[in-house]
Amino acid sequence: MQDEGPTSRVPRLISGELRESSYLCTQITPTTFMLINEIFYSLQGEGVHMGKASIFIRLSRCNLRCSFCDTEFDSGTEMTIEELRDAIAPYPGRRIIWTGGEPTLQLTEETVAYFKALGYHQSIETNGTRRPPAGLDYITCSPKKEAMQLLHRNFPDGVGEFRFPVGSPADLPPAVSELPPAGAYLLSPIFVGETQSEADKAAIELCVSHILEHPEWQLSLQMHKLIHIP
């Protein structure tokens, strides 16, 4: 029988509610709307898929507060899944990156299935404190101290890449043997300045030195900040 097309396979999302989580922050149960911080179309700026055209869907809310983060956590626009679908439809790229904030606070298995049925490849950028929903094509985990003891529980099958932001020796990662399996283990020197767009020479030197001593790691520069794109 001939396929009726992707739209016919889009599952209906169930309604949900906002409630308090027992761990770290507010979480959202499956719902027909999401709080969106911003949507933009650009190149993936770092990591294994650097340089690929991607639709960035930045979700509001986070359960951590990191000094180097470039996101305003709490503001955003409430959008239905259908409005979100229509907002990204004009972009020719078919790669979605769910980022934040901490996207696992809002992203559900139902939402992932919805966009998968529309033919999108979906990645997530997470801090590792919560298990991502099933169905994602790629997981980037940038673990924070609060998540280190949770990584094996939250990622029993491993991740696509671990990416550790590094600004000082205290930020250097544990041994690879202590982490779940990953396709790549990356060190990302932080950027500084008022707009966090200036390379930190000391952080770069620290990363390079660590990688030379531990060659299972590799360097991941934030290319989008170097060439000044979103």
Residue ranges with predicted function:
Residues 1-6, 17-18, 26, 48, ...:
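Intrinsically disordered, low-complexity regions
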Residues 3, 10-56, 60, 65-68, ...:
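Flexible, acidic/Gly-rich N-terminal and inter-domain linker regions that tether
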Residues 5-10, 29, 89-91, 131-132, ...:
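Intrinsic-disorder/low-complexity coil detector
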Residues 9, 23-29, 76, 108, ...:
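A ubiquitous, low-specificity "background" feature that marks scattered single residues
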Residues 34, 40, 49, 56-58, ...:
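Broad hydrophobic/π-residue packing in well-ordered secondary structure
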Residues 37-41, 53-56, 63-136:
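Conserved Radical SAM active-site core
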Residues 104-230:
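Conserved AdoMet/S-adenosylmethionine-binding subsite of the radical SAM
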